[in-house]
Amino acid sequence: MLGPAADDFVRTRLTHSLEVAQVGRALGQALGCDPDVVDTACLSHDLGHPPYGHNGEKALDVVARQIGGFEGNAQTFRILTRLEPKTLDAAGRPVGVNLTRASLDAVAKYPWLKGRGPGGPGGRSARKYSSYDDDAEIFAWMRQGAPEGRRCIEAQIMDLSDDVGYSVHDVEDAIALGRLDPACLTDSKEVDELLEATRAWYGTDLSADDLGAAFDRLAGRPYWIRSYNGSVADAAHLKNLTSEIIGRFVSAVASATRQTYGNGPLTRYEAELVIPEETAAEILLLKGIAVRYVMEPREHEPVYLRQRTLIFDLADVLMTGGGKGIDPVLLDVWHRAENDDARLRVVVDQIASLTDTSARAWHARLCGMFSEV
């Protein structure tokens, strides 16, 4: 996701989260979930993502390697339960926003500590997890009585809504910004290259034929857009495309889940979200379009290296500054820290709280130079 400075049309984490909540609310309502729980999960799911998105996440993981690493989902949990100063404990320390178990659990996309889920310390759970060891106590409280390693249905809805939200709207952005000319997708060679790029990027088990069939299904719908010149009519057509595709996905998943689990309210661990294979293939295809026409062309741009360097610079200057530059809301934690590891976690929390714009401003102020990132 590009920052707003790149183009005013492009979405931010906030607008993306609002769109995810809209999708999640529709699907949750169709399945009889508690709307507040689903809404909370969808609106909160990206709180822990640092400046520069996944590129910044990789940089902070390097910075935090000696203290257990950095992961955006675990940072989200830390914000909700430790960092946000809405509720204080007896010692006056922040303990988050005081959410219920159900709401916190619905945010847990990867419901395990680092290395304690699928694949163990050397597997997937070492890369994707929902809590640091520092926060294990409150994580254990949240998961009390929950099946080990299993996500509640509200978390599954949040995760799918996230996929739907960014896959559909990234395609919308690519077309509106001129990165993708829909007319090029009438060329069979171009489509073949798109399918291969999708499979290469996501490492999917789906064959090119499976993805090709998904493309044919979507491109065969009357609302599919075949050209775009920025006119009012085309802009309306593009907006209608996003609405129709989102509705298609929500209806397919709701129908399949209802066929399996019946018509009663489906909450917590009473059901698993059922995603038809064709729907999963169509979602992956749209994600592949975003990869092919937005992510791949930017993947090796010098800006990515500059972003990581900026984060490394900030970590160094904050760590060696004796608390100088740390926000007042985190300064008490810094002064209470008993060792450098604890202070480094404060520095990571601080950098993760910044936006792209504020990270550049902090770098210019603290590192004594103007950032061109």
Model-flagged regions — what are they?
Residues 3-9, 41, 147, 227-232, ...:
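Glycine- and acidic
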Residues 4-16, 47-52, 63:
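Catalytic phosphate-handling regions of large nucleic-acid enzymes and associated NTPases
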Residues 6-37:
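Alpha-helical phosphate/pyrophosphate-handling elements in metalloenzyme active cores
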Residues 16, 52, 56, 72, ...:
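Hydrophobic (often cysteine-bearing) scaffold residues that line and stabilize catalytic clefts
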Residues 22-25, 30, 47-237:
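Sequence-structural signature of the catalytic-core scaffold of metal-dependent phosphohydrolases
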Residues 38-43, 159:
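Short alpha-helical catalytic segment bearing the HExxH-like zincin motif
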Residues 199-338, 342, 354:
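C-terminal subdomains that position terminal phosphate/3'-OH groups for nucleotidyl transfer/ligation
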Residues 339-372:
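Short, amphipathic C-terminal "tail helix"
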